[in-house]
Amino acid sequence: METSQEPLVTQKKSKPSVWRSMSLFLVPLLLSNVLQSVGQLVGMMAVGRWLGVDAVAAVSSFFPLFFLLISFTIGIGSGSSILIGQAYGAKNEERLKAVVGTTLTFTFLLGVVLAVIGSIFTLDILRLMGTPENVIHVSANYARILFYAMPFMFLYFAYTTFLRGTGDSKTPFYTLIVSTVINIALLPVLILGMFGFPKLGIYGSAYATVISTIATFLVLMVYLRKRKHPLQFDKTVRRYLKMDKELLVLLLRLGVPASINMILVSLSEIAVISFVNHYGSNATAAYGVVNQVASYVQMPAVSLGIAVSIFAAQSIGANEFDRLKQVIRVGIWLNYIIGGVLIILIYVFSHQILSLFLTEQETLYIAHRLLMITLWSYLLFGNAQIISATMRASGTVLWPTVISIFAIWGVEVPVAFVLSHYTKLEILGVWVGYPAAFAVSLLLIYGYYQFVWKKKQITRLIQ
């Protein structure tokens, strides 16, 4: 393919090594994920310590539902990051702004639709999930607070995706610092009712999230305008708010399969938590806390998946296919180095970590067993994520999605159901489903990458 423009990143001869470039990009990205998890961790700790295990169970029951309803937007975001990366690599600022404008409008409208659906059907869905009756109404009301603010929260998430797509991982990190500080500062004020504010209990946690996110989005918009950033909300971006039909179709082609995958992942989590809920609120609380801890283990995988996708998209946009191969290799190595060290540390200090969230011995015991069974397998998850991210950056989204869906619904959910219902493992059988699914996913995704994708001719999507 002809390339008439130089890549935006830098001239080819002056580019640093992939190891250096990806590491420099990865540090703020990892710190962002750490900070985001710290914010969630502090929120969960505040709820658990101040309000008790039932409040933790209420929040834990809600998150699979929330993830289900935002899955489509996450998929669209992944599609927009591919297009942003390729446009940036091709040094095509007009198309860059077109992607921004089109994505913003579609994302906002989608947020409105999901806010309405979520607020109306929250209670019904939580009942289908088997949420314990002693927490279901609190969980539903907590959810509605976040749903009402969803359209505006989505705009903030979209802009952080755009920035990372251009190779800027620092600005999203700085804005996240602002958001986290505001959120943590508001938690005691709104939960306990301080400085004249009403005592909102568990709902104070939701309001703190909403206020901090929207405030940070406004700060980010002002910053981009003052810096005259290419992604600022200027006349060109506003012109494309009407949505470029060609780009929208391409965005949906890239984003819908990823969204379907996200939705089915969410449904699987709803299925899994329904298995867990069968064992009572202690098991539900343990599940929620271990998910928080596992989010730290997933950080290298998720961060590297984002980094590899962006670097791969920029390499494809600039027609630098030798660099693309290096991106894949470096991503896989970093996954095992960073993820391996983190997993070892969490295994060693597992009791101390879980005790930060939980005080009841039965819940601690359940959570510890879950952690021991599943933690190591996130290395396999990370490897599969990196290979999949590379293929998605080229526009190959269907088969990575099919493989992921099969691993979840053909392996994880059936294994969790059968082992928990028909063997002596009981609740331990639920946990075994995770490593089984991650192993199958890696084997299948690597097979497709090696024997099919590598034989394809790769061309950029943004012209």
UniProtKB/Swiss-Prot annotation:
Asked whether the keyword Membrane is assigned, the reply is yes
Subcellular location per UniProt equals: Cell membrane
> What membrane topology does this protein have?
Multi-pass membrane protein
Q: What keywords does the record list, in alphabetical order?
A: Antiport, Cell membrane, Ion transport, Membrane, Transmembrane, Transmembrane helix, Transport
Sections of the chain in a coiled coil: none
Q: Name one Pfam family in it.
A: MatE
Listed transmembrane segments: 24-44, 56-76, 106-126, 143-163, 177-197, 202-222, 256-276, 293-313, 330-350, 370-390, 397-417, 427-447
Would you name any one GO CC term? plasma membrane
Q: Which GO terms describe its molecular function?
A: antiporter activity; xenobiotic transmembrane transporter activity
**Top-level lineage group:** Bacteria
Q: For this chain's UniProt record, which GO biological process terms are given?
A: monoatomic ion transport
Family annotation (InterPro entries):
MATE_fam, MdtK-like, Membrane_Transporter-Flippase
Family listed: Belongs to the multi antimicrobial extrusion (MATE) (TC 2.A.66.1) family.
Supply the name of the protein: Probable multidrug resistance protein YoeA
Q: Which organism is it from?
A: Bacillus subtilis (strain 168)
At the highest ranks, the source species' classification is: Bacteria, Bacillati, Bacillota, Bacilli, Bacillales
- The primary gene name is yoeA
